[in-house]
């Protein structure tokens, strides 16, 4: 089983989870992660790096230059959106694997009589709340941060003295960064208006009372200036930390969550294990008419 990774930590988690679910279904021994995207990503994409090593999960990685070169060719071919039989033929010749895009993934997952021949190579984002939540007991243990990062978190003032010592904490994630600076990301996603966050805070406080707001953003200076005079607001500044999973862990430990149109804070909220949590998510995830499968029935969509 191959999983071709791309994107930031949130996207990598969706891709790994989908591959893991299918691996268990097919009873395959190994799950091989292809990280060649991070060495040769498209110019229009935001530069990312492999980050799944921040969790206690098991995987193999492509090791030979031959395999990496072959996958790199496949990635370039896949950008042209060729007919499935053409792409599958290329996969078969180069990798001796079956190409498995998202649409075919669900057919295979739901086929109880599926016969495994050459194995499969998953190639999509798999951003599907229903898929992940229907396998919650399987997926939740996978994305627990490793011991080294847990020790770092336990030493953070924002965790020890703010999140752990306040019963009513709400994480608030504002994604700016590449949604502003990268034309492709800006056109596809767009930045949520502040009105969304104001409505979300009002909703949670109407239900659960006054909250301590823990602000997370990839534009820390902007966040610090924006919330400088707000009582009970704390802006998390881990900008010099190279581990994205730390802020995600902190989000998950807040009582409630207000997420951005970002898979990163989606996972922060999903990993939250408070039974009476309130999660507020954007009703409109993408700019234009693109539809999302990331909404959860139990979350409040504004």
From Swiss-Prot:
In terms of CDD domains, this protein maps to:
Fut1_Fut2_like
Q: What is its EC number?
A: 2.4.1.308
Keyword flag Glycosyltransferase = yes
* Membrane-crossing segments per the record: none
Cellular component, GO, one term: membrane
Q: Which UniProt keywords apply?
A: Glycosyltransferase, Lipopolysaccharide biosynthesis, Transferase
Does this UniProt record's set of keywords contain Glycosyltransferase?
Answer: yes
Q: What are the disulfide bonds? A: none
Task: Give this protein's Gene Ontology molecular function annotations.
Answer: galactoside 2-alpha-L-fucosyltransferase activity
Reactions catalysed, as given in the entry: beta-D-Gal-(1->3)-alpha-D-GalNAc-(1->3)-alpha-D-GalNAc-di-trans,octa-cis-undecaprenyl diphosphate + GDP-beta-L-fucose = alpha-L-Fuc-(1->2)-beta-D-Gal-(1->3)-alpha-D-GalNAc-(1->3)-alpha-D-GalNAc-di-trans,octa-cis-undecaprenyl diphosphate + GDP + H(+)
Q: Name one GO biological process term.
A: fucosylation
What pathway annotation does it carry?
Bacterial outer membrane biogenesis; LPS O-antigen biosynthesis
Matching entries from InterPro entries are given as: Glyco_trans_11 (IPR002516)
Remarks, miscellaneous: O86:H2 and O86:B7 subtypes share the same O unit, but the O units are polymerized from different terminal sugars in different glycosidic linkages.
Family under the similarity heading: Belongs to the glycosyltransferase 11 family.
Summarizing the function annotation, the protein's role is: Involved in the assembly of the O-repeating unit during O-antigen biosynthesis.
Name this protein carries in UniProt: O-antigen biosynthesis glycosyltransferase WbnK
Lineage at the top is: Bacteria, Pseudomonadati, Pseudomonadota, Gammaproteobacteria, Enterobacterales
């Amino acid at each position: 089983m191959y999983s071709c990774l791309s994107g930031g930590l949130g996207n990598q988690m969706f891709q790994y989870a989908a591959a893991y679910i299918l691996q268990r279904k097919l009873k395959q021994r190994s799950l091989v992660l292809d990280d060649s995207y991070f060495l040769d990503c498209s110019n229009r994409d935001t530069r990312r790096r492999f980050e799944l090593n921040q969790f206690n999960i098991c995987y193999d990685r492509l090791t030979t230059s031959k395999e990496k070169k072959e996958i790199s060719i496949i990635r370039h071919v896949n950008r042209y959106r060729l007919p499935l039989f053409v792409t599958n033929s290329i996969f078969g010749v180069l990798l001796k694997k079956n190409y498995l895009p998202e649409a075919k993934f669900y057919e295979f997952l739901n086929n109880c009589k599926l016969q495994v021949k050459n194995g499969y190579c998953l190639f999509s984002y798999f951003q599907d709340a229903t898929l992940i939540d229907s396998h919650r007991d399987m997926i939740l243990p996978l994305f627990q941060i490793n011991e080294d990062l847990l020790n770092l978190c336990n030493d953070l003032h924002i965790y020890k003295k703010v999140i752990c010592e306040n019963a009513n904490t709400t994480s608030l994630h504002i994604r700016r960064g590449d949604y502003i600076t990268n034309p492709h990301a800006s056109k596809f996603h767009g930045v949520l208006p502040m009105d969304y966050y104001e409505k979300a805070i009002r909703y949670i406080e109407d239900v659960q009372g006054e909250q301590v707001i823990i602000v997370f953003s990839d534009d820390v200076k902007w966040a610090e200036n924006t919330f400088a005079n707000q009582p009970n607001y704390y802006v998390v500044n881990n900008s010099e930390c190279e581990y994205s999973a730390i802020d995600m862990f902190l989000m998950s430990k807040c009582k409630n969550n207000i997420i951005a149109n970002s898979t990163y804070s989606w996972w922060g909220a999903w990993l939250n294990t408070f039974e009476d949590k309130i999660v507020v998510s954007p009703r409109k995830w993408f700019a234009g008419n693109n539809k999302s499968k990331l909404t959860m029935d139990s979350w409040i969509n504004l």
